[in-house]
């Protein structure tokens, strides 16, 4: 345990000043995402999505951000997955973008809303064909006997859909997370981190600085 407790580093890659924080959190998110992409971080759109089950037990998993805008953050998934079942019972979720290599992270709380079939179909048809086929193969979050079962099913589906378009599975869709709060964290020297949180009040965003 002592070896783990000795692991530390200083955060020296920047500061976040009040005058540099815009009124709209999506403007800041867009600016930070550009920094992330320019820094060539692997999987810059990877985000942890947390849901809770009917007993209040939290679960997390990594998904990829596929769109964001004034309305919120979008991801796609199997609608029979554990996270989709959780969202059906409790649509309150949280998202974390862990950009640790550049001393930044963004934490979001919000409500997950199902996307329209039109938007889901548009994105599904933009995916590589192999990814479309994989959506048919995996009954996400259910137990399987071995990886071989997945590979066999994939081969079967690949043959089945060898010609023409792969249809959209009824059990595949996506969510828009409408944010209620968005917190930006910038690592600071001597652990004096900069934290700003935006909270949605009506149609407006209220911005506050938080102690580290």
UniProtKB/Swiss-Prot annotation:
It comes from the Bacteria. Keywords: Flavoprotein, FMN, Oxidoreductase, Pyridoxine biosynthesis. GO terms for molecular function: FMN binding; pyridoxamine phosphate oxidase activity. Binds 1 FMN per subunit. Its cofactor is FMN. FMN binds at residues 61-66, 76-77, 82-83, 105, 140-141, 185, 195. Substrate binds at residues 8-11, 66, 123, 127, 131, 191-193. Its EC number is 1.4.3.5. Pathway: Cofactor metabolism; pyridoxal 5'-phosphate salvage; pyridoxal 5'-phosphate from pyridoxamine 5'-phosphate: step 1/1; Cofactor metabolism; pyridoxal 5'-phosphate salvage; pyridoxal 5'-phosphate from pyridoxine 5'-phosphate: step 1/1. One of its GO terms (biological process) is pyridoxine biosynthetic process. It catalyses: pyridoxamine 5'-phosphate + O2 + H2O = pyridoxal 5'-phosphate + H2O2 + NH4(+); pyridoxine 5'-phosphate + O2 = pyridoxal 5'-phosphate + H2O2. It holds the Pfam family PNPOx_N. Catalyzes the oxidation of either pyridoxine 5'-phosphate (PNP) or pyridoxamine 5'-phosphate (PMP) into pyridoxal 5'-phosphate (PLP). Belongs to the pyridoxamine 5'-phosphate oxidase family. Homodimer. This is Pyridoxine/pyridoxamine 5'-phosphate oxidase. The gene is pdxH.
């Amino acid at each position: 345990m002592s070896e783990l407790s000795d692991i530390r580093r200083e955060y020296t890659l920047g500061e976040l000043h009040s005058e540099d924080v815009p009124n709209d959190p999506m403007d800041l998110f867009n600016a930070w995402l550009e920094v992330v992409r320019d820094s060539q971080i692997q999987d810059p759109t990877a985000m942890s999505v947390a849901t809770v089950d009917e007993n209040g037990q939290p679960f997390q998993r990594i998904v990829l951000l596929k769109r964001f805008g004034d309305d919120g953050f979008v991801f796609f998934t199997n609608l029979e997955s554990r996270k989709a079942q959780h969202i059906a019972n409790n649509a309150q979720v949280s998202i974390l973008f862990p950009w640790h290599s550049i001393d930044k992270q963004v934490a979001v709380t919000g409500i997950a809303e199902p996307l329209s079939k039109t938007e889901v179909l548009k994105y599904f048809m933009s995916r590589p064909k192999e990814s479309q086929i994989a959506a048919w193969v995996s009954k996400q979050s259910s137990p399987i006997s071995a990886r071989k079962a997945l590979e066999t099913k994939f081969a079967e589906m690949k043959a089945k859909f060898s010609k023409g378009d792969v249809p959209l599975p009824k059990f595949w869709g996506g969510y828009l997370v409408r944010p209620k709060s968005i917190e930006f964290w910038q690592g600071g020297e001597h652990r004096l981190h900069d934290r700003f949180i935006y909270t949605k009040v009506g149609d407006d965003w209220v911005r506050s600085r938080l102690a580290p």
